[in-house]
A protein has these predicted regions:
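Conserved beta-strand hairpin/beta-sheet module of binuclear metal-dependent hydrolase folds
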Residues: 23-85, 172-175, 179-183, 282
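Short acidic active-site motifs
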Residues: 108, 308-313
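Short, Lys/Arg-enriched N-terminal segments with co-localized hydrophobic residues
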Residues: 6-19
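Active-site metal-binding motif and surrounding structural segment of the metallo-beta-lactamase
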Residues: 75-122
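Active-site-proximal loop/helix segment associated with metal-binding centers of metalloenzymes
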Residues: 166-170, 186-219, 252, 262-267
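Active-site neighborhood of phospho(di)ester-bond hydrolases with catalytic His/Asp-centered motifs
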Residues: 69-71, 93-101, 121-124, 181-184, ...
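Metallo-beta-lactamase
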Residues: 24-28, 123-170, 220, 226-228
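FMN-binding flavodoxin-like domain, especially the glycine-rich phosphate-binding loop
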Residues: 193, 203-239, 243-246, 288-303, ...
Length: 416
């Protein structure tokens, strides 16, 4: 997930009413048994939720068997169990479908299993492994593969394996014939309008959904596109996500939004130089790198990062065919704004693993060494040795910077 400093929401007002205390019948025999959290302002200690959120879970009655689809976070187990018990005796539950095992969806699972020990948890192989390390006790489990089904008597559930949306364990559950897709985190949003659980009861939440996508799914764009391909030819009349409103009006709109946000942008080769320079020395080096990289067929732009927003920086990281960082040492460390940039690397879908490093220092010079370790740890290749300058760069250092820019630029173009 993306830290709070990496995502800045542009969205809007919040309505306050009483939260939903009871269950909601979505379709005959299909119930919402989730929990509303309209006051939440930071999700998982990581990013802002101006509109709160919901933890959606569902109970499905068949002619012969009963299934629960996902649970809620552990702190809301009492409310959750009250809703379950208002519909069925827990010991009569046959299946617990775990589409995703992150604690906001599995936190109540351990307690639920105590109430229905004969129930079978249905999940992917990865989810079974994760649950073993979350529950630390035995449980009945049925591992499913792509296309497997479960029959509830007059209703059938089909499972669609979609890893890394946004954990390795994720799957969709489709209620066949009724064309309802349970997607856990995918296609949802952190949005709660208390007492209103359907998307046609609330304002358009496209901004909230985009912000949610940006914070959670942006590093997994290829996986989003693969998942959309798996359901492209299915009839879908309703999407039941784990966060935000149930999408019964125009469900394909949410899918198409996720797909559009995940598609790559192609507009020629780009090399970006990102630097910070309190005293102008690293900036002189950045100018030299840019001169060296300025060859036909490549767009080269140098950015002082203090002039850019976090969203602008993340866009640049994602679009680049090569990244060259200019980092001075300040108090034996990388300056915080540049640490933030290096942290953003894990929050986007990168198309390059080629990087360069340069920077100035006065007497210790740790910053470039730290950055080199960070980049190599993320799988980046540095085809040119790091260039460092003690205070003001000499003519020889400037020449090395120009050569760095030229060498990396030529490498980008040679890759085609």
């Amino acid at each position: 997930m993306t830290p709070i400093s990496r995502c800045t929401s542009n969205t809007i007002k919040i309505r306050r009413t009483n939260t939903m205390q009871g269950t909601v019948e979505i379709k005959p025999g299909l119930y919402w048994i989730g929990s509303e959290d309209p006051e939440l302002r930071v999700f998982d200690d990581l990013f802002p939720t101006e509109h709160g959120t919901t933890y959606n879970a569902y109970l499905l009655k068949g002619a012969e068997k009963t299934a629960i689809i996902d649970t809620v976070k552990g702190k809301r187990v009492d409310e959750y169990m009250d809703k379950v018990k208002s519909l069925v005796a827990p010991e009569t539950i046959d299946y617990i479908i775990a589409n995703h095992t992150e604690p906001d969806h599995s936190g109540a699972l351990g307690y639920l299993l105590e109430q229905c020990p004969a129930a079978t948890v249905v999940c992917t192989a990865a989810a079974k492994n994760f649950l073993g390390n979350l529950l630390h006790k035995p449980f009945n489990c049925q591992v499913v593969k792509d296309g497997d089904t479960i029959d509830l008597g007059d209703r059938k559930l089909r499972f669609i394996i979609v890893p890394f949306l946004h954990w390795p364990d994720t799957m969709f559950t489709r209620l066949e014939d009724e064309n309802i897709l349970f997607t856990c985190d995918a296609f949802g949003a952190h949005y709660c309008s208390p007492g209103k659980i359907f998307n046609d009861e609330v304002e358009d939440i496209a901004l909230a959904r985009h912000f949610y996508f940006d914070c959670i799914f942006r590093p997994f764009k290829d996986n989003v596109l693969s998942a959309v391909e798996k359901i492209r030819h299915d009839v879908i009349d309703m999407i039941c996500p784990s966060h935000g409103p149930i999408i019964r009006k125009d469900p394909w709109k949410a899918i198409q939004q996720f797909e559009q946000w995940s598609k790559p942008k192609s507009s020629g080769k780009k090399l970006f130089i990102l630097y910070i320079s309190p005293h102008g020395n690293t900036e002189k080096m950045a100018e030299a790198v840019a001169r060296g990289a300025d060859i036909d067929g490549l767009e080269v732009i140098s950015y002082h990062i203090s002039h850019l927003s976090s969203n602008e920086l993340r866009n640049l990281l994602e679009e680049a065919d090569a990244l060259i960082f200019g980092i001075p040492t300040i108090v034996r460390d990388i300056p915080k704004p540049m640490w933030d940039v290096l942290a953003y690397l894990s929050t986007v879908k990168l198309k390059t693993n080629i990087a360069g490093l340069f920077g100035s220092y006065g007497w210790s010079g740790e910053a470039c060494k730290m950055a080199e370790e960070r980049l190599k740890g993320m799988g980046f290749k540095l085809p040119v040795p790091v260039v460092r300058s003690i205070f003001k760069p000499t003519d020889a250092i400037i020449t090395q910077c120009e050569e760095m820019g030229r060498s990396i630029a030529e490498g980008v173009l040679q890759k085609g």
